[in-house]
């Protein structure tokens, strides 16, 4: 769950919750995750063109901890699609910091990640996986996990998050 302090920081626009708490908040409120991420609705197909993308469509998430750094910048590829159950993102992953303990997250749903650039390290349960450019992983997000760039590298990934409604 979320602490009262975390909820107050979110309500006060001091912190933007990480993905796991955001999914939990959506479930408690009975709304889909996309409700928090979009402000328009399109019933038909949604096309996202590179020439129209900008940084105002991005969200920086920390991972479950209000004190954690925001190591991932999410660029939504579907923010105008109403009623969606999948959340596709292009994600810029900042280099890992030495000595940082990663806070594992867990939430309902599934995630698919495809590495476009760089090297990614994924802690999943008790296992660690290294993914390089062209590699992918599909996993149940109810298992504790953390996604970060390996060593001092940056990475760019395509991530698709499915959350049941």
Spans of features found by a protein language model:
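DNA major-groove recognition helix of helix-turn-helix/homeodomain DNA-binding modules
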Residues: 20-35, 41
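Short, conserved beta-strand element in jelly-roll/cupin
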Residues: 90-94, 105-122
